[in-house]
UniProtKB/Swiss-Prot annotation:
It is a multi-pass membrane protein. The modification N6-(retinylidene)lysine is found at residue 296. Residues 333-354 are annotated as: Disordered. This is Rhodopsin. The record marks 113 as: Plays an important role in the conformation switch to the active conformation.
Length: 354
């Protein structure tokens, strides 16, 4: 084996020389140089100082502006809450442990950090799935006479919490486990070992199918149908420049949303699956660390894609930050007017990130 398995940990380095020590008790500078841990701590600090303000501002602005408290925006508030879970439950812990070079909070701390980081990440993932599904229902109208209301929005939010818990809770109760991963400064699900009694194999397969493949299929289907619906509406009004402009705007938004999802989850899922199917093979600590923080960075760029790109949210944020005035109001108003369709029931505002 090209790694060292101990009680409740797995270090991706052979202990032939006897240098490997528990990541709960000793600095892991034999894995990578101390400066790499400093870089990791700096990256976590960057995610904290950018992720917290934008997600907190999203919640604050929604409370301040009644027009934002619509059912279609509930899922965006849930997305902001999930990102704050990651900021406080994952980023702050990882920054502190990185400064020490090992997971200083011990086994209980590893369980807590792994749980909150996984819960926040999964809430964000399923929020994107529900967001895509809601837009598909509203725009494509697969169910005739369907009217999206507050009860539907609440059901969507509850669903994201339920699905997140079905991923984050099992490792706490014996189906798989949380252990330090990568550079041993953050904790995640055990993809690395076949530890007796934890059924890691079945849990990893469950996670890959239910919490990656299914969300991927739903998002591609919903946004694919949405783009087709908008294109059909635009084709019926070829003489309308505003309709064509709205179609291009919607298509651009959908492409950005899908690319953001893929950047977030493809690297992590691919590397985790590779490690799971090649247990015992040689791989460095950075191999798992980098994809994990691709997923963590979603707490910063998800709000930029799904909230700041939305004209209504953006306008309210600017007026809140500028003491009730929007210095760009004329530009925002002109852009909003130009993006409306003339006679189509499908508009860019109904399929935009918010």
């Amino acid at each position: 084996m090209n790694g060292t398995e101990g009680p409740m940990f797995y270090v991706p380095m052979s202990n032939a020389t006897g240098v490997v020590k528990s990541p709960y008790d000793y600095p892991q500078y034999y894995l990578v140089a101390p400066w790499a841990y400093g870089c990791l701590a700096a990256y976590m600090f960057f995610l904290i100082i950018t992720g917290f303000p934008i997600n907190f501002l999203t919640l604050y602005v929604t409370i301040e502006h009644k027009k934002l408290r619509t059912p279609l925006n509930y899922i965006l508030l849930n997305l902001a809450i999930s990102d704050l879970f990651m900021v406080f439950g994952g980023f702050t812990t990882t920054m502190y442990t990185s400064l020490h070079g090992y997971f200083v909070f011990g086994r209980i701390g590893c369980n807590l950090e792994g749980f909150f980081a996984t819960l926040g990440g999964e809430m964000g993932l399923w929020s994107l799935v529900v967001l895509a599904f809601e837009r598909w229902m509203v725009v494509c109208k697969p169910v005739s006479n369907f009217r999206f209301g507050e009860n539907h929005a609440i059901m969507g939010v509850v669903f994201t919490w339920f699905m997140a818990c079905t991923c984050a809770v099992p490792p706490l109760v014996g189906w798989s486990r949380y252990i330090p991963e990568g550079m041993q400064c953050s904790c995640g699900v055990d993809y690395y070992t076949r530890a007796p009694g934890y059924n890691n194999e079945s849990f990893v397969i469950y996670m890959f199918l239910v919490h990656f493949i299914i969300p991927l299929i739903v998002i591609f289907f919903c946004y694919g149908r949405l783009v087709c619906t908008v294109k059909d509406a635009a084709a019926q009004q070829q003489e309308s420049e505003t309709t064509q402009r709205a179609e291009r705007e919607v298509t651009r938004m959908v492409v950005i949303m899908v690319i953001g999802f893929l950047i977030c989850w493809i690297p992590y899922a691919s590397v985790a699956w590779y490690i799971f199917t090649h247990q015992g093979s040689e791989f460095g600590p950075v191999f798992m660390t980098v994809p994990a923080f691709f997923a963590k960075s979603a707490a910063v760029y998800n709000p930029c894609i799904y909230i700041c790109m939305n004209k209504q949210f953006r306008h309210c944020m600017i007026t809140t930050l500028c003491c009730g005035k929007n210095p760009f109001e004329e530009e925002e108003g002109a852009s909003t007017t130009a993006s409306k369709t003339e006679a189509s029931s499908v508009s860019s505002s109904s399929v935009s990130p918010a």
